[in-house]
Curated annotation (Swiss-Prot):
Single GO MF annotation: ATP binding
Origin: domain of life: Bacteria
Binding site for Mg(2+): 19
GO CC list: cytoplasm
Entry's localization field: Cytoplasm
Positions annotated to bind L-methionine: 58, 101, 243, 274
PANTHER family linked to this entry: S-ADENOSYLMETHIONINE SYNTHETASE
Requisite cofactors: Mg(2+); K(+)
Binding, ATP: 17, 168-170, 234-235, 243, 249-250, 266, 270
Protein name, per record: S-adenosylmethionine synthase
Organism: Bordetella pertussis (strain Tohama I / ATCC BAA-589 / NCTC 13251)
Amino acid sequence: MANNDFLFTSESVSEGHPDKVADQISDAILDAIFTQDPNARVAAETLCNTGLVVLAGEITTTANVDYIQVARDTIRHIGYDNTEYGIDYKGCAVLVAYDKQSPDIAQGVDRSSEDYLNQGAGDQGLMFGYACDETPDLMPAPIWYAHRLVQRQSELRKDGRLPWLRPDAKSQVTFRYVDGRPAEVDTVVLSTQHSPEISQASIREAVIEDIIKPSFPEGLITPKTKFLVNPTGRFVIGGPQGDCGLTGRKIIVDTYGGACPHGGGAFSGKDPSKVDRSAAYAARYVAKNVVAAGLARQCQVQVSYAIGVAEPINITVYTEGTGVIPDEQIAKLVREHFDLRPKGIVNMLDLLRPIYTKTAAYGHFGRSEPEFSWEATDKAAALKQGA
């Protein structure tokens, strides 16, 4: 972003949002398969509607997985355990319609053990990674705080402090930037599903005092900050009953909240041979290490691939004028220190593990849990020394 004064907005959604229900089921299927068969090829898509879950896509695996039970367990964990919520893990219908991966794709992706590192990309495409110094996790402030809000909503729902909360929720945060830096929160929107008996006045007070204000450090919320809580006035019907949920519908929530471009490929349900996912994780890893090394305040990385070809077509670094050395020099360091071939990424980030269900809600980036290996800054020292 240019160094000037402006407003910028990002949104997030809770784990109970219908599209996120679908994402979590898809990644839970992937994890269940990877627990038995880490070399599986998985493209698991999910649709969820009132009382119905449809599982479809392409899976090639030796694993024996009860897909219906995985879907039910995921819905239960999210909190849809009552027919009043529109979907109930015990009684919903689950339809399974998986095919195997196309052999035309497999011949370009699979390699012999002797040619292991030259596994081709599972598809063509372009991916972006981004990092900046606006938050401790080197994420843009609007999306980082938007995630904190819906995480807080989930926490207060699950621990019973606000028992009238239901699983579906959305947040939106608008920051005022001064000289290109986040200075204060201009507007917070938080819509949360709730039980029918609670008054709107009680919802507004609890959301502002118990969810919004504790989610921000002192100084960001000012007397001028606007709070919009359940602006429609009522949010009883939600989740898959309110809207049909589909895997891959929240790609901006999953990434950087619109602060940088997006290549268009979704993440959830895909094994790491799909560069839509693995290369986007690697691009974040690169960008975060560049910023952690002090080589730039902001870093955007683009990589692109051709199906069946291992080497990326391009690796492009853009620091928006914040770099301490030229962008071309940073890109050269990236090529020296990061193996961005698909199998190189899998090895570098240890991606053949059942780690993906956690990624499917509250963002794939800016997370501190140990599963998120692409959030490590272990290459920063080498980049700094090389510069």
